[in-house]
């Protein structure tokens, strides 16, 4: 089982996160940020990852530290659970519709953290959630997972749908990228021999 457990404590957040890459899409998420919880449940379901997240953060300031730090912890968990990356597909992509929104994501588990982010979210807030924090979440994720992730908006006018489409699409892309290819089970998918 490709599994990771992350405990990350700072002056701003206290996080415990578990991840099973070979799960069934089950999740138990409690970050103190309702919209982020919703997005992570969708991410886990559509990625077929078993994911638990417990976070106590300084949400009396705002949701920035919690959102970014959960992204960091999730990235650390992916890196840990993937180990040496033997046999993985490495690449994954998905064009996903969410009503009027159409979101493309593409991932390379390359060992290099990079985010190509192109979402035009019309609203500054959805409920109490600052929509600019979606980019902060994914930056924290890619830097710590050491993955390249592109998120592109091809259509969409509803802020909730755009963000939901991005998390669902990223889950599906990562599901494809972490999948084991039987023909290459003992190989690292790189001519360098390491990722």
Features from the language model and the residues they span:
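Structural preference for solvent-exposed beta-strand-turn elements
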Residues: 1-195
């Amino acid at each position: 089982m490709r599994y990771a457990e992350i405990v990350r404590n700072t002056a701003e957040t206290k996080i415990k996160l578990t991840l099973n890459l070979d799960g069934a899409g089950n999740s138990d998420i409690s970050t103190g940020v309702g919209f982020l919880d919703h997005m992570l449940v969708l991410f886990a379901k559509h990625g077929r990852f078993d994911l638990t997240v417990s976070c106590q953060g300084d949400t009396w300031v705002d949701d920035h530290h919690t959102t970014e730090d959960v992204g960091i912890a999730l990235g650390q968990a992916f890196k840990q659970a993937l180990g040496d990356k033997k046999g993985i597909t490495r690449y994954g992509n998905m064009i996903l519709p969410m009503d009027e929104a159409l979101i493309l994501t593409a991932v390379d588990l390359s060992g290099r953290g990079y985010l190509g982010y192109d979402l035009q979210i019309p609203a500054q807030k959805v409920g109490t959630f600052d929509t600019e924090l979606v980019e902060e979440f994914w930056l924290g994720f890619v830097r710590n997972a050491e993955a390249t992730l592109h998120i592109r908006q091809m259509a969409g006018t509803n802020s909730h749908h755009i963000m939901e489409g991005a998390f669902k699409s990223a889950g599906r892309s990562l599901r494809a990228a972490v999948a084991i290819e039987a023909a290459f089970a003992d190989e690292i998918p790189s001519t360098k021999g390491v990722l």
